[in-house]
Amino acid sequence: MAKAKRAYVCNDCGADFPRWQGQCNACGAWNTISEVRLAASPSVARNDRLSGYAGDNSETKVQTLSEIDLQEVPRFTSGFRELDRVLGGGIVPGVAILIGGNPGAGKSTLLLQTMCFLAANMPTLYVTGEESLQQVAMRASRLGLPKDNLKMLSETSVDRICQIAEKEQPKIMVIDSIQVMHVADVQSSPGSVAQVREAATALTRYAKQNNVSVFIVGHVTKDGTLAGPKVLEHIIDCSVLLDGGTDNRFRTLRSHKNRFGAVNELGVFAMTGQGLREVSNPSAIFLSRGEEDTSGSSVMVVWEGTRPLLVEIQALVDYSQLANPRRVAVGLEQNRLSLLLAVLHKHGGLQMADQDVFVNVVGGVKVTETSADLALVMALLSSFRDRPLAKDVVIFGEVGLAGEIRPVPSGQERLNEAFKHGFKKAIVPAANMPKGGIDGMQIHSVKKLSEAIEAFDEL
């Protein structure tokens, strides 16, 4: 009997090493390398297992780009316009999609609803390894979903799943979840780095060779990132994250990698008694402001994927009783907040060194683009002076370290979106000022932070 081989794999990034060492050379993490035993297999079987990854098993040949037959890939809808938007316009045949999210976010519910919709028109297969078939059927009954056409399978062996799928010939398949799947050639427990990597590789290879779209459910760590080795995200074609806790009825689906569409595309859903329902106008739920004007609140226009989104940002500036005042940012980068406070002090003359500063993006949206800088500065100024901004004012623009206001992409589209939602005034960078203006909208163009503060005083 052939002797099992040993390998040493980093639990964070999945890098391989010939022997154990304290630090991973690939990602720099300490004490993350563990031993993995690989079952010995015949060379022929191993070569067959590794061949044909990017397509069918036909004879490979070298071609020039001009010789490749370009055909429009026919996408099919998932039944959710928001999910289709995040995926780039629909589901591509043969794609491997990794969907992650916190426990209770609604990953299994979203995929079950999608599969029940697709089962009416094409063969489908839902593979569950975490729940029994009875539990999935109970959820489908509770949600009022049709159960006649969707085929179910309770299995955790990737080899048997691929064998059954070869017999059933589904066009789309769900694997729930990758952390409980195992490959026979890897002698380690399910969920380990080696098992997750080999299982994802086998499922992606099956998707490419058979032109089957595969949804793979993945767990997340306590900091909200996808669990497992980083190589997992390199193997699959599309990576999306469903965000939203059990205390929030709204869920946001964001793409972090997409070989067939735009990244950072955002889809919004609402969790109801009948499952997830898409939100056609996300700006409305993020702008649920009170009737009275309050200080420390401003509205910005952020660009999420391929569409603008109006989001409210709130700031609270108050005298601190601590030696080191607190700086808390929810939905924004902490370092960005510290940077803007320094710019306000240097170029705006506002001293907040003895103030506690709390910033929150309403609705649980996470904003990463720099177009939110000017709106955040205006919210801080409003709270510091205890003077509210008018409700019909929208603000966007990037703030530089020298106090200059830099332009942002798609300025005209942002203003049009704000005007469509009833905003009559705007503070924008001078370079984003429309040439002909917008009828019915008063636009203040600013080049420096001092000009933005003057515009705040005029509104």
PLM-predicted stretches and their roles:
Residues 2-12, 16-85, 92-98, 105-123, ...:
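Peripheral, non-AAA+ core regions of ATP-driven protein-machinery
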Residues 102, 129:
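P-loop (Walker A) phosphate-binding loop of NTP-binding proteins
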Residues 124-128:
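Conserved RecA-like ASCE P-loop NTPase motor core of nucleic-acid helicases/translocases
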Residues 133:
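Divalent metal-dependent catalytic cores for phosphoryl transfer on phosphate-bearing substrates
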